Amino acid sequence: MENVVIIDGIRTPMGRSKGGAFRQVRAEDLSAHLMKKLFKRNPAIQQHEIDDIYWGCVQQTLEQGFNIARNAALLADIPHSVPAVTVNRLCGSSMQALHDGARMIMTGEANVTLIGGVEHMGHVPMTHGVDFHPKMSLSVAKAAGVMGLTAEMLAKIHHISREMQDEFALRSHQRATQATQSGAFANEISPIYGHDADGILKRFDYDEVIRSDANLKDLAALRPVFDPVTGSVTAGSSSALSDGASAMLITSESYAKNLGLKPRARIRSMAAVGCDPSIMGYGPVPATQMALKKAGLVLGDIGVIELNEAFAAQSLACLKGLNLLDSMDDKVNLNGGAIALGHPLGCSGARITTTLLNLMERRDVQFGLATMCIGLGQGIATIIERMD
């Protein structure tokens, strides 16, 4: 079976969904921008050599409908001969796109795939047009469809206090602020034009969602939003609503060698699992365990971890379940996470994998893990290995 290598990964800045930078930029344009940029950064790979495009997106309607992968590819002037498909595993969609593209290469069906994802949550809200089957409640708790209530459940089961959640949320903003100021995001962000608060067109090369002024006092003052009476999950300890896209170029190792490319990492293992929808946020735990088993590794072998922060309560429950609380500050979400950057659903999987790749290079570690929870009870994980 062919080894799959990552040639490059980039993302857009994360724009605030409510009146943010991309309020006049469409999801297809965010996607096409990255498709074009990847080939400018990697001119040795010709666009006509792409065997397929896999693009994650959750709300496939309005501007994100009718196969946004193909629409974006056409906007990016990618040759018409290159096919494209939109992938939906909810929050894990662009990581699933990575897995789908990788499997095509592993089986010899492809040499090069372009993968990524997008979500414009300002233009296409998360619940737009959603209509759950009435009989679903016969087998699944009604509250399982409300992500914030699943986080509340995890907080209760794993004894995650309000104070722990607020501290974790603050850490996310502080880490993301430090990463921005130090230039840690520079290699992964592909600047793009949007509009500032005054409606003036400007070039954005930073994430506008991060709150550099976040503090515990303000976080503690927020009221629980999902369970106002006995809850502890607030807007401040939940992932921000944001708009963004991410993209990666992956190839077979033999193709990269023949073309004289210098791959940045090798995909060691991939895993997707199911779990109880009522505790959907715990999915990264069994997904990580499965990915480690497939890779023949133990968690101690992993030098850097990107865990998508859907909620602080959910993230802390996973870290507790993986025995990572004590090593969190040395390994996990070192540049902050979705609480600070936001969680554009179809974008996040490839986004955290790209951030992971850059962190591994900066910290000179061999193995890295990207993992995330998925609404309605799933988890997904990818382990990558740096290449010299």
UniProtKB/Swiss-Prot annotation:
Keyword field contains Lipid metabolism: yes
MF-aspect GO terms: acetyl-CoA C-acyltransferase activity
Protein name per UniProt: 3-ketoacyl-CoA thiolase
SUPFAM superfamilies: Thiolase-like
UniProt entry keywords in alphabetical sequence: Acyltransferase, Cytoplasm, Fatty acid metabolism, Lipid degradation, Lipid metabolism, Transferase
Gene Ontology cellular-component annotations: cytoplasm
Source species: Photorhabdus laumondii subsp. laumondii (strain DSM 15139 / CIP 105565 / TT01)
Catalytic machinery residues: 91, 343, 373
Gene: fadA
Recorded metabolic or biological pathway in which this protein acts: Lipid metabolism; fatty acid beta-oxidation
Protein function: Catalyzes the final step of fatty acid oxidation in which acetyl-CoA is released and the CoA ester of a fatty acid two carbons shorter is formed.
Subunit structure: Heterotetramer of two alpha chains (FadB) and two beta chains (FadA).
Subcellular locations according to the entry: Cytoplasm
Catalytic activity line of the entry: an acyl-CoA + acetyl-CoA = a 3-oxoacyl-CoA + CoA
Matches recorded under PANTHER family: 3-KETOACYL-COA THIOLASE FADA, 3-KETOACYL-COA THIOLASE, PEROXISOMAL
Top-rank taxon, per record: Bacteria
Gene3D superfamilies for this protein: 3.40.47.10
